[in-house]
Amino acid sequence: MEYTGIEIFVRLFKSNAYLIKIFKDFKQLETEDEMRANESLEKHATFVMTTLDEAISNIDNYDFVKDLLTRTGCSHQRFSEFQKDNFLKIRQPFLDAVKITLGDRYTDYMENVYTLTINFILQGLMDGYMDDTAIQIKLDSGHEIDRNIHEANDTTFVKAAES
């Protein structure tokens, strides 16, 4: 899973070099070798792959997967340079990395399954990113607070602003 995740991001940055600048922990990386050896990129790639694996493993539980993708997509709002269309840019690198990982086991049928699956996942992430039921507050101190509007109240925001 770790190898596949790194492969996805190497391919993503190779085809969309400007995207690496969004990531503060590895935006200085320039070569594929640097990317493959970087611990911060490895950590992020593993985190992304864990989320993808969780979504795929639970694909028969629509409510769980929808909630996971909504929360994950929404969490990307805190990155000022991130745009929802960035999710789509991982589609082909994901499919290419899966093909490499599966080798001879990657059939036309598997390609169709993974294409449908990644399209569903990416749409869920984009929907979550655009979810307007979440509020984010960035305090002057630079701390960010995410609150679900249904759970938040005025006291929550006052306490957050005072801290």
Please place each PLM-identified region on the residue numbering.
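Globin-like tetrapyrrole-binding proteins
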Residues: 1-163
